[in-house]
Amino acid sequence: MNTVRVTFLLVFVLAVSLGQADKDENRMEMQEKTEQGKSYLDFAENLLLQKLEELEAKLLEEDSKESRNSRQKRCIGEGVPCDENDPRCCSGLVCLKPTLHGIWYKSYYCYKK
């Protein structure tokens, strides 16, 4: 019976001493991994920031370009007076001097091309 107790006590002491050493090693490993994780997080954050900036630049570029499908705003329709220097006629219309009718009003009107 004493042999069992001594064996048990010996195994217990070894487990506690080795467990304590493993605990210190684990703590050091966790600190190293945490430091590495921070550097990885910084790298990932910078990469994400670059991608977001590229995406923002693309979106702003697309907004600045005029789409073919976009509707013209504040354009002048056919037969409406326009300014010779700043014609705002709708697409398919040109600002021209009128022939016969309308010559007594303004000097230029929007007409079909």
UniProtKB/Swiss-Prot annotation:
Please describe the organ and tissue distribution of this protein's expression: Expressed by the venom gland.
Q: Where is the signal peptide?
A: 1-21
InterPro entries from the xrefs? Toxin_22 (IPR012627)
Q: Whose protein is this, by species?
A: Cyriopagopus hainanus
A GO CC term attached to the entry: extracellular region
Subcellular location field: Secreted
Which intervals of the chain form a coiled coil? Answer: none
Which cysteines bridge via disulfide bonds?
A: C75-C90, C82-C95, C89-C110
What's this protein's name? Answer: U11-theraphotoxin-Hhn1a
